[in-house]
Swiss-Prot record:
Keyword terms, alphabetized: Aminopeptidase, Cytoplasm, Hydrolase, Metal-binding, Protease, Zinc, Zinc-finger
Organism of this sequence: Xenopus laevis
EC number: 3.4.11.18
One Gene Ontology CC term in the entry: cytosol
This protein's name: Methionine aminopeptidase 1
Binding site for Zn(2+) 3: D220, D231, E358
Residues reported to bind Zn(2+) 4: D231, H294, E327, E358
Alphabetized CDD domains for the sequence: MetAP1
Length: 385
């Protein structure tokens, strides 16, 4: 702590002379923050550290609101932020797109914080819902529609197209199918799909950066209709990509399909991570540990928790009627991740590329049904066909 002129200690109930100031507050430009001793400073830490968070949040807020378009000038939203790779956000973003009132909306759609109260009610529970025949049919319908919407996005992917344009097409495709785009306002996520380019692991926010030849981009689609969510994603090549990108994308898809091959009643959810890790590591890649697959039906995210790395401690055994996603995120370098200051965009800490594929699955009496399977090309993903 730095020495400063005499002040009164700011710890509640202490009136001693204070000559020490919090060094983090000095760095962040926070006025005050004087303490008489290390003991008083430590005793106030629980509440004092909130000042640091607020100051940091205020510092990264762009002068121009990121949710409004102001000409074509690209604004750096986070001056001083140290990016791990070459990708940069292209701000400001366009406003959050409206959804017609006649389309059924999930409970978080109009919540000021985008909070799903139905999910919060079940937060922390490991109980896995067994879907009724009616529920299963609802999931089949919505997953088929989600697949159609991903097909629209797939046709958009090429050099020069922005992820913002892909998001716009996805939004319109959802509306035309009487679906709500599930990501929109989910805990205030500002767009209708996630687009994750190169070193972005997941939850990338579509913006005005044009895709470039050699990029890889994951488009993650979830749609909501008649009370159910359907979720899937694929990673696409943009133009001609190098052999490293091809090997990463191919291995990631193989990890997903090898895990799916093991889905059947009686299998522990924790086993899927062992299968994925074995194949990824055999090819020299690592597995992201911070994000995982999840149960899905009337709730966007719920039990079970489905980690993609080995020796995990996931709870639960597969039973007929369970519906969940597997969505491995595989990295060229290390598995460690960071998050951009937007609070969403997860990126590799070493700046190397990451790829992902996802399906929503139904456990049947004898195995599983891939609810989001592509109907064309014998179910093969777009990077193959």
């Amino acid at each position: 702590m730095a020495a400063v002129e005499s002040r009164v200690c700011e710890t509640e109930g202490c009136s001693s002379e204070a000559k020490l100031q919090c060094p983090t507050c000095i760095k962040l430009g926070i006025q005050g923050s004087y303490f008489c001793s290390q003991e008083c400073f430590k005793g106030s830490w629980a509440t004092h550290k909130l000042l640091h968070k607020k100051a940091k949040d205020d510092k990264i807020k762009p002068e121009v609101s990121p949710w409004t378009m102001d000409g074509e000038v690209n604004t750096d939203p986070w001056p001083g932020y140290r990016y791990t790779g070459k990708l940069r956000p292209h701000y400001p973003l366009t406003p959050m797109r409206p959804v017609p009132s006649y389309i059924q909306r999930p409970d978080y759609a109009d919540h000021p914080l985008g909070m799903s109260e139905s999910e919060q009610t079940l937060k922390g529970t490991s109980q896995i819902k067994t879907l009724s025949p009616e529920d299963i049919e609802g999931m089949r319908v919505v997953c088929r529609l989600a697949r159609e919407v991903l097909g629209v996005a797939a046709m958009m992917v090429k050099s020069g197209i922005t992820t913002e344009e892909i998001d716009h097409a996805v939004h319109l495709a959802c509306i035309s199918r009487n679906c709500y785009p599930s990501p929109l306002n989910y805990y205030n996520f500002p767009k209708s799909c996630c687009t994750s380019v190169n070193e972005v692991i997941c939850h990338g926010i579509p913006d005005r950066r044009p895709l470039q030849d050699g990029d890889i981009v994951n488009v993650d689609i979830t749609v909501y209709r008649d009370g159910y969510h359907g979720d899937l994603n694929e990673t696409f090549y943009v133009g001609d990509v190098d052999e490293g990108a091809k090997r990463l994308v191919e291995t990631t898809y193989e990890c997903l399909m090898q895990a799916i091959d093991e889905v059947k009643p009686g299998v522990r959810y924790r086993e899927l991570g062992n299968i994925i890790q074995k194949h990824a590591q055999a090819n020299g890649f690592s597995i992201v540990r911070s994000y995982c697959g999840h149960g899905i039906h009337k709730l966007f995210h719920t039990a079970p928790n489905v980690p993609h790395y080995g020796k995990n401690k996931a709870v639960g055994v597969m039973k007929p009627g369970h519906v969940f996603t597997i969505e491995p995120m595989i990295c060229e370098g290390g598995w460690q991740d960071e998050t951009w200051p937007d609070g969403w965009t997860a990126i590799t800490r070493d700046g190397k590329r990451s790829a992902q594929f996802e399906h929503t699955l139904l456990v049947t009496e004898t195995g599983c049904e891939i609810l989001t399977c592509r109907l064309e090309e014998n179910g093969r993903p777009y990077f193959i066909s």
